[in-house]
């Protein structure tokens, strides 16, 4: 078994303190868990990562000198998501673990709510890398609350490039019903980039593209 380096000892220090439940002074509970499964945490660490937590702990109810350890319910997260959230907070923040990546969508929202901008950036990168036919519409909606230009543009671009498949899916029908304005924007962009094929030379053209040769002016352009 490899011996941890000094750097690994240093970067893993907070996680070690958390795992040992040393000097725990606050408990975090998810919406779907009971008191017995609350997660141990430390106010100082949470406050150092998040201004929202810092402001929360400055309230009188948390300043009262007592041996009682307060339990805070973070209702926007499930238990396994909260575990991943605390895991990241106690990490060196250099990258997302496999466990945190698994919950990138929910942690993206949590990072925005608790103003942990570095976590939000990492989750955004993970979400963009995972763009697919199955989740592109969902990520486009996610990018609106609050508006995230990078995620919005990447999602739009993916949808535009795969519009023929996405537009024929049941998911798109539901998307149109729930997000009519976004659906209109998608169709506007998609119409501009529709591809046509010349029956004369076989070349492809966009609707706004130039003819590649004279024969294209006489060939029939067909949608592909």
UniProtKB/Swiss-Prot annotation:
GO term, biological process aspect, one: protein ubiquitination
Domain of life: Eukaryota
SMART domains: BTB
Keyword Cell membrane: no
All copies of domain BTB, residue ranges: 24-98
Claim: Membrane is one of the keywords in the record: no
Associated pathway: Protein modification; protein ubiquitination
Keyword tags: Ubl conjugation pathway
Disulphide bridges, residue numbers: none
PANTHER family reported in the protein's UniProt record: BTB/POZ DOMAIN CONTAINING PROTEIN, EXPRESSED-RELATED, GENOME ASSEMBLY, CHROMOSOME: A05
UniProt comment concerning the protein's domains: The BTB/POZ-like domain may mediate the interaction with some component of ubiquitin ligase complexes.
Entry function: May act as a substrate-specific adapter of an E3 ubiquitin-protein ligase complex (CUL3-RBX1-BTB) which mediates the ubiquitination and subsequent proteasomal degradation of target proteins.
Binding partners and assembly: Interacts with CUL3A.
Name this protein carries in UniProt: BTB/POZ domain-containing protein At5g48510
The organism's taxonomic lineage, starting at the top: Eukaryota, Viridiplantae, Streptophyta, Embryophyta, Tracheophyta
């Amino acid at each position: 078994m490899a011996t941890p380096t000094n750097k690994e000892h240093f970067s893993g220090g907070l996680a070690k303190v958390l795992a040992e439940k040393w000097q725990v002074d606050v408990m975090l509970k998810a919406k779907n868990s009971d008191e017995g499964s609350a997660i141990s945490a430390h106010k100082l660490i949470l406050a150092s990562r998040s201004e929202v937590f810092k402001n929360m702990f400055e309230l009188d109810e948390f300043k009262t000198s007592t041996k009682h350890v307060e339990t805070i319910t973070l209702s926007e997260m499930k238990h396994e998501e909260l575990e991943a959230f605390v895991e990241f907070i106690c990490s060196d923040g250099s990258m997302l673990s496999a466990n945190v990546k698994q919950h990138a969508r929910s942690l993206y929202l949590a990072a925005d709510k608790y103003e942990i901008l570095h976590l939000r950036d990492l989750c955004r990168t993970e979400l963009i890398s995972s763009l697919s036919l199955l989740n592109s519409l969902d990520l486009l909606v996610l990018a609106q609350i609050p508006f995230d230009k990078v995620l919005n543009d990447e999602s739009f671009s993916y949808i535009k490039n795969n519009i023929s498949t996405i537009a024929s899916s049941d998911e798109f029908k539901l998307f149109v019903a729930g997000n009519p304005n976004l659906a209109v924007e998608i169709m506007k962009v998609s119409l501009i980039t529709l591809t046509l094929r010349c029956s004369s030379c076989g070349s492809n053209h966009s609707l706004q593209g130039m003819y590649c040769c004279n024969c294209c002016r006489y060939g029939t352009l067909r949608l592909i």
